[in-house]
């Protein structure tokens, strides 16, 4: 029971850490050194082809509880998260419905950066059972590699997304050290991890509004704690940013969307 509960909460918390955060408005970010081209790296049809290929294979992996194929279509946080989710599904016989990724698209935000890695932020529609939209982050690490799904974030109720250029125009990628904002993207991720770890005792608590992710994590923690106490077990959670696991896209108004 103890190991089983730990596995479930590990999968849930990993999913939560893939949340997107908007950079605060302020001065325009300092331009980064990488080059920008006039056209986006993918057309809308190419984005659809990439997304459809990956999600079709992922659906097959979900149905077969197949973790061996995942590295061919996933990388980074999403590879770790989906592997954990499928391992939990193998043990419980049930795959959480929140792992569903809608196939319909609301908006594609396509990078115009000429170098690598390149990113595409795809915002889906809601699911058939009216779950929230998903933000999908696809990355291509080099010219000789296919795009892979790097991150998935559930866009909780009340989330306000920044405005982006249309897919025909494309958007510039940001960097973890972008300046001209209230804080750099890396500092924003560090601050949010501190909020998750320390809650009301975080030094950033007074500067941050409540959000659904932290509320849901608090509820989940309380539920798991009750189960642990019934079985004379203990639980411990640690939240810290993974070095390099960050993706940034510039919004139309000069802010950053950070995942």
Predicted feature residues:
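Compositionally biased, intrinsically disordered low-complexity regions
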Residues: 22-25, 153, 246
């Amino acid at each position: 029971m103890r190991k089983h509960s730990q596995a479930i909460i590990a999968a849930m918390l990993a999913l939560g850490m893939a949340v997107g955060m908007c950079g605060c408005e302020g001065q325009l970010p300092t331009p980064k050194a990488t080059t920008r081209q006039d056209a986006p790296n993918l057309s809308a049809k190419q984005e659809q082809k990439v997304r459809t290929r990956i999600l079709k294979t992922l659906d097959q992996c979900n149905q077969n509880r197949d973790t061996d194929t995942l590295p061919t279509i996933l990388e980074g946080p999403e590879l770790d998260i989906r592997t954990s989710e499928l391992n939990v599904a193998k043990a419980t016989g049930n795959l959480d419905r929140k792992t569903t990724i809608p196939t319909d698209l609301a908006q594609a935000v396509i990078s115009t950066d000429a170098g690598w890695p390149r990113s595409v932020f795809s915002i889906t529609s809601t699911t058939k059972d009216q779950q929230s939209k998903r933000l999908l982050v696809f990355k291509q690490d080099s010219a000789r590699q296919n795009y892979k799904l790097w991150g998935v974030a559930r866009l909780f109720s009340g989330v306000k997304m920044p405005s982006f250029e249309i897919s025909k125009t494309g958007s510039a990628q940001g960097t973890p050290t972008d300046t001209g904002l209230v804080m750099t993207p890396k500092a924003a991720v560090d601050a949010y991890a501190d909020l998750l770890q320390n809650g009301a005792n975080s030094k950033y608590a007074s500067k941050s509004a409540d959000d659904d992710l932290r509320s849901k994590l608090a509820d989940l923690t309380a539920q798991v704690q009750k189960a642990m106490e019934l079985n004379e077990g203990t639980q411990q959670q640690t939240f810290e940013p993974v070095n390099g696991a960050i993706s940034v896209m510039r919004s139309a108004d000069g802010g950053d969307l950070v995942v």
